[in-house]
Amino acid sequence: MPHFLAKLDFKPLEYPLIEGDFCFHREFLSLKNPTKSCVYASFKDRIFLLQKIRRANDFLIKSEKATPLKREVLKQALRIYSQSFEVISHNLQENSKHASGKKTLDLGTFEDFIQKNQAPILIEIGFGSGRHLIELAKNNPTKTCLGIEIHTPSIAQALKQIELLDLKNLHILQGDGRLVLESMPNHRCEKIFVHFPVPWNEKKHRRVLSEKFLNEALRVLKPRGFLELRTDDSLYFEDSLKLALKNFQCEIEIKKNAQIPVVSKYEARWNKLKKDIYDLRIYSLEWNETPFDNHAFDFSFDTITISKKSVGTILKTKKIIQEGYFVHVCNIYENKGDFLVELSMGDFDWPVRLFVLLTENQIFYLNKSPLKTLNNHKAHLLLQNILSQKGIG
């Protein structure tokens, strides 16, 4: 992660610090940990935060992951900010020419991406090595291919291949595929691939393929579009088949040990061991007439008035856990009566770290609201109650 170490200097900086498109507006001090602060900054019209941590012999200044910037922009921001310090060490050199310039899609702008996309969509959830996903994009140049993955090394590997092969129709999103599907409009996908997911036979609630996921997939698929599960785990296959048989709006196709053009490293290993591999295709048959409206999920704070005296109580609020979602106030930072609230919240399957800015006149999430899903919206409503001191304790 880009960062720099600086000698301790207890002389406060004079904000704002401005250079080019960068502005470092002010510094918020932690109410929970006096050695931590957040620098509130902007690049053009995008807000971001830097973490500033006072240690025994130095300051550590680095990015705040909840407000990401492109790596080179972040490095430039840190280089500019470091000019106000006596730097001990840093890793802010220019990127190697061999580094990938391709970036993942931002969850915060994913809704706009889907709305603007006019091409048929093919999705692979949990693409691993990326072999199948890359071939999918190469063989379907007029279609939009979307790979969804949570594993960062797999994503980095796929991004390098996308850039190397110049696959302009292939996009990568880091997130939980279950939540991503829930946020998508009806009938936007032709095919959804789930190849060799973790079986989670001892913790079945963690599986990708569940009754809820199947219903969302069939809603998102066009009529005659299909969800394809490929697995070497017989119990996962049998449980998934039972889920499909309970559904009244699908057609099922089953294959065993079918030969396919693209074989992953994982599959090649099982082939050598003569292990059975199961394919389950579930076709969507009906046109879902129920309107999809995630715009009903309002993530604004327009109805809340914050008492500054209540901030201490908010900070002491214990993590609140409900069925499927939670809210945890991790920290609060202050600058002249304005506050930054650091949060972990949302759906248990894919919780998010966010910051909310509280000023006398406005309250809003920095840069992005949570993904528009039902559990995230429930978590937002719970957060409103916490901030307004309703139903706490």
Curated annotation (Swiss-Prot):
GO function term, MF aspect, one: tRNA (guanine(46)-N7)-methyltransferase activity
Family: Belongs to the class I-like SAM-binding methyltransferase superfamily. TrmB family.
Residues that coordinate or bind substrate: 232
Record key words, sorted: Methyltransferase, S-adenosyl-L-methionine, Transferase, tRNA processing
Pfam families, per database record: Methyltransf_4 (PF02390)
Coiled-coil residue spans: none
Primary role: Catalyzes the formation of N(7)-methylguanine at position 46 (m7G46) in tRNA.
Domain of life: Bacteria
One GO CC term, this protein: tRNA methyltransferase complex
Residues bound to S-adenosyl-L-methionine: 124, 149, 176
Catalyses which reaction(s): guanosine(46) in tRNA + S-adenosyl-L-methionine = N(7)-methylguanosine(46) in tRNA + S-adenosyl-L-homocysteine
Gene designation: trmB
GO-annotated biological processes: RNA (guanine-N7)-methylation; tRNA methylation
EC number of this enzyme: 2.1.1.33
Pathway of action: tRNA modification; N(7)-methylguanine-tRNA biosynthesis
Entry-linked PANTHER family: 3-DEOXY-D-MANNO-OCTULOSONIC-ACID TRANSFERASE/TRNA GUANINE-N 7 - -METHYLTRANSFERASE, PENTACOTRIPEPTIDE-REPEAT REGION OF PRORP DOMAIN-CONTAINING PROTEIN
Name recorded for this polypeptide: tRNA (guanine-N(7)-)-methyltransferase
Disulfide bonds: none
Keyword tRNA processing in annotation: yes
